[in-house]
Amino acid sequence: MPSTVTRRSAAERTAQISSAAQSLAREAGLSAVTLRAVATEVGVAPALVAHYAPSMDTLVGDTFAAIVGDELSEVEELARSRSTASDALAAVLASLLDEGRAEVTLIWVQSWSLGGRNETLAARVREQMDAWRTFLAGVIDVGRGAGEFRCDDPLAIAGQILGMVDGLNAHSLVAWQDASERTRLLLRSVEAMLDLEPDVLVGRLPV
């Protein structure tokens, strides 16, 4: 560790600590975000991190919210790029089960476990789950209005879909079934929930 520390403003140091925490979480999950690990990542003494981030529970919660919030923004943009609700829903769900999202999947899975002992994290998780459910319900509602989907309660269906996504992504961490099989299983289930003909969503997957 350097014997001298570059002096930075409070805002700069806070941003640096936040960036380091996010980098650690993406590399090894939320459990890797510890005072000592963040300090090592930044290249400063743990006491300096503690000064600018006095609550590790808050830092972990904020790290989670930043990473999954970025993912939601990315997926919202993906949905907007599609011309129909059916195309948007199929693209979004396939993206969420893509193996390239393994780092965020681990963060989600650990958040439910760690949130049992970290109420700040638990609150962030609930907020993000609500945001994701609202987003999916919006896509479904657009499809219902356009006559593509048939359902009575888009919000309830969105919650059920998220439960399936979370479960299948958890399965992916131990390589149970391959990604294409998990995606087809999910889309076929959603087709039934939205009263669609078989393959309306599955048929939109790349061959």
What annotation goes with each model-predicted range?
Residues 1-12, 202-207:
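N-terminal intrinsically disordered/low-complexity leader segments
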Residues 13-16, 20-58, 62:
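Helix-turn-helix
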Residues 54-58, 80-84, 116, 120, ...:
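Residues in soluble alpha-helical coiled-coils and helical-bundle/repeat scaffolds
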Residues 58-59, 91-98, 123-130:
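A ubiquitous short alpha-helical element
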Residues 62, 73-105, 157-161, 183, ...:
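Hydrophobic alpha-helical connector segments
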Residues 65-70:
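Short, basic, alpha-helical segments at the C-terminal edge of helix-turn-helix-like DNA-binding modules
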Residues 88, 100-122:
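Amphipathic alpha-helical segments used for helix-helix packing
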Residues 122-126, 130, 144-207:
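Hydrophobic/aromatic-rich alpha-helical bundle segments in the mid-to-C-terminal region
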